[in-house]
Amino acid sequence: MVAWFKYGSNVAKLAVRRTLSQSCSYVARTRVVPSQYRFLHATVSRPKSQSAPVPRPVPLSRLTDSFLDGTSSVYLEELQRAWEQDPNSVDESWDNFFRNFVGQAATSPGISGQTIQESMRLLLLVRAYQVYGHMKAKLDPLGLEERPIPDDLDPALYGFTESDLDREFFVGVWRISGFLSENRPVQTLRAILKRLEQSYCGNIGYEYMHIADREKCNWLRDKIETPTPTQYTRQRREVILDRLIWSTQFENFLAAKWTAAKRFGLEGCETLIPGMKEMFDRSADLGVESIVIGMSHRGRLNVLGNVVRKPLRQIFSEFSGGTKPVDEVGLYTGTGDVKYHLGTSYDRPTRGGKRIHLSLVANPSHLEAVDPVVVGKTRAKQYYSNDVDRTKNMGVLIHGDGSFAGQGVVYETLHLSALPNYTTGGTIHIVVNNQVAFTTDPRSGRSSQYCTDVAKALSAPIFHVNGDDVEAVVHACELAAEWRQTFHTDVVVDIVCYRRFGHNEIDEPSFTQPTMYKVIRNHTSALQIYQNKLLESGQVTKEDIDKINTKVLSILNEEFLASKVYLPQKKDWLSAYWAGFKSPEQLSRIRHTGVKPEILKNVGKAITTLPQNFKPHRAVKRIFEDRAKMIESGEGIDWAVGESLAFATLLVEGNHVRLSGQDVERGTFSHRHSVIHDQETGERYCPLDHVVMNQNEEMFTVSNRYLLFL
């Protein structure tokens, strides 16, 4: 391979480079170029090509989208040479492929001297944008990041020059999605590059080509490679503007009233709020009825006030040191925690006229500790609401860039997403990526290019978006909701933004990031950027903007005055669903837990009787025979039998029982055997699933999972 790389053709070099790129080795093939738009990078001279041996052909029916990767370029060239000399020398499927390709090219107008190699190289360029286009996207609102742009995005690498820009090329009509499927077999290179730049190198960078699923990739290509960018109506833009003003003015109001208070504000990522609201609106349109939200401290007060609608007067009262009612002090409702750890729940009306229940889970200072809590609560809500398709209850987790890359609980939670009896039908992850973790730069906080690279292990799509472009944030959030409801797997929205102040408002960030904060001090806010955009478009006037600002400030001032006399009258973040929740004092009283002997014998018979045609391991069969004798005689009952009887009687009483752990089905010491296996067919059988008539199969859940700790 080394000799081939040294003396081979341009395409051969490209093939080796792409092979190396699969191990994420970008250093040898990238260079920093100016971030402004350009089609052609510098051309590098290379030695004359030599032939490579013809690889073994693969039937066309077995090809996937990956046949367009770099190594296939050499493959196809050699196959074509062999086919031109003798069509019978290649597989029949390849013979049909070349005949079809040449036939279409010959009948397409405006193509003079066009070759299969040129078209295939053009398709490789298209694929390069789909794979690496995010590395050229304009993601950093501060413009400080020097982004290495891969040579793969340079048309010169594929043999194209500026004189080719207005030439028409045959790109074919392929069984893939995106603009290659639009039945336009002939396009100019300039038009193709413009479309690719527009789709993949704007203010959203899409990472999805690591997903080994044609249907999913095609679905995303159809969403990404649209003929024109997403255009919002005047009414829709007014809604987005209103939500962005609320987000911005809320932080400004807190900063003006409580200058020295810690609030971990959202300044620099105010677009999160309209993004979340639009995501929830879209989710409701797609059938979601309940969303469980987990997040840490950054922007939490803004989410509490603007998304889940905790009364503003209550938030302001907490800033002023307001107290809880006497009857709540010391009870299980939780007291004494800081205001940016508290949760709440709310039935939110959506833009589409629906209502969706939102629940923001209380969160400690331990970053990401809430992740498994949110996923577990979502799974529980799905069970108790009989949401078997997992389309009505959804989890949303909001992370910081440092914690998403650095906390092990994130990876552990991600890997629960597709396990049987743990999946919730997909969680939407939003990363508030302000490009600094407290005082730590990204280069010291992770070894990967993106903080979201950990999610690639799940084949989750990742949408990187410039946090200064509110419409791009809205689009990415809506697309995430559509993905989740379509494919029921995790998806990540990475909002690349900045933190206008320190980690908290009394911290001085210039101690450790002087260059960044010199830029931030003079950087225009996302609200001002959007207002200017709308004014230039003529869709919104200055009077319209002033009217919204006046309305928002008036409400904030009214709520501030009301906060001076505010006294909470209910347990703030416990909704009606928790009305019967018992206190520790009520739960800790001694209760009678015994059951009648005849009940024990009845359930004992159920959990020791196996189907007639079921063939367990002979040792397991002997264990169940011994258990039946124990239950019948009442003598020699061991721990495993006692445990099974306890679970069975809980099921008889209508309780949901769930066991989770790496080896819980069999038991670490081969003692439980709650799930047994037919030695001939491999069929599984769980006796505790058959304790009562017509028992819900999820009423008793026992499920192995990955190793958590030793």
For every predicted segment, state its role.
Residues 2-443, 447, 453-454, 458-463, ...:
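Conserved internal helical-beta-strand scaffold that buttresses enzyme catalytic cores
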Residues 119, 470-477, 527:
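Amphipathic alpha-helical transducer elements in NTP-driven molecular machines
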Residues 436-438, 472, 500-501:
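Short gly/pro/ser/thr-enriched loop/turn and capping motifs at secondary-structure boundaries
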Residues 464, 472, 477-485, 490, ...:
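C-terminal catalytic or substrate-handling cores of phosphate/nucleotide-
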Residues 497:
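Flexible glycine-/small-residue-rich
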Residues 514:
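A mobile, often basic/glycine-rich helix-loop segment
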